[in-house]
Amino acid sequence: MSRNKNVSMYVGAFNIIMLLILTLHFAYMWNNVYNTMLKTPFMGSGNKLMVFTIFLLIFVTYKMWGGFKLGYIKLVNLVFSQSLALITTAIGEYLIIALTAGRVDSMGRLAGLIAVSTLIDLVFCVLYDLVGIRIYGMIFPPIKLLQINGVHKNHLRYKISNRSDKYEVCEEISYK
């Protein structure tokens, strides 16, 4: 198997696990907190449909904001993308629950609970990304490069050093 295929498999597995954990967190919150706040709680298939809807919402927002790019973008950019995706998802959660429920006892309390749940998800994602990038670095160490310079020295080494997690210039030679 090529390196790119292995990277894709690792990143895909990492993303599926993260998506499932975020969905399970929502399912727990839905079944034990949000659903109990409704005047007429959902039953059986309604609960499953709500969890599936949020699963799709998380997937779409992560895809839209680039939250699935572990190993392709820097950690700061990855966390920022995932934060935007989770905030967008939280707004969507609130709107979906408010619109499907018709009437909730306390809309302010619901918004506060969703905000706290989103903060928990954000902390989880940061920790999960840190662990994921550490494992990624062990499985796929930086590619060792030989830099060959011509008559005019360029700034390529500086650009490559910005991604020390992906590339490592081992030696630099010059021909004239």
Segment roles from a protein language model:
Residues M1-I139:
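Signature of alpha-helical transmembrane segments in polytopic membrane proteins
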